[in-house]
């Protein structure tokens, strides 16, 4: 990520105040799933302009009753992996760029009410050159990070910027790898914070 120009602070202030007053269900709640179901969202709209199979898929999805994800935990799913590590990705981003990332829900486009988007966060630190920039996070489980977003991710970010009326979006991909046991953790590097290859490491505690 890099900075092209200084952010228009007054414009971003107005937009964020406007968005705070709009209906935006909190992410992963029942209301959020229903809100997304009743429109086309940034994360799925690529199907509408992709292969016939994907076009059929999105039509089929909209013909089915709304699906609310259960509270049960499947620790092997890609969804769980992304949800588990997303807060760590945000913390890394905030630390790396000395910023603060605010959480926002899913909103409707001002004019096209069926078009909806929910970024993983927005830079809200006014004195940061990335103020007002959207953040989209992916934590792949098997795919190798190449530095180039997949087509569906690229479309997702374009729609997010359109719906939120913000001109920039940082795409962050992170991979967190688990050690098999405590011994493997201790043997990888000479400290508790860096691996033998100089990468960051640490302990993640998860509560259910």
Segments from the language model and where they lie:
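Nucleic-acid nuclease catalytic cores
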Residues: 95-119, 123-208
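Charged, glycine-rich intrinsically disordered N-terminal tails and low-complexity linkers that flank
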Residues: 1-84, 88, 180, 191-194, ...
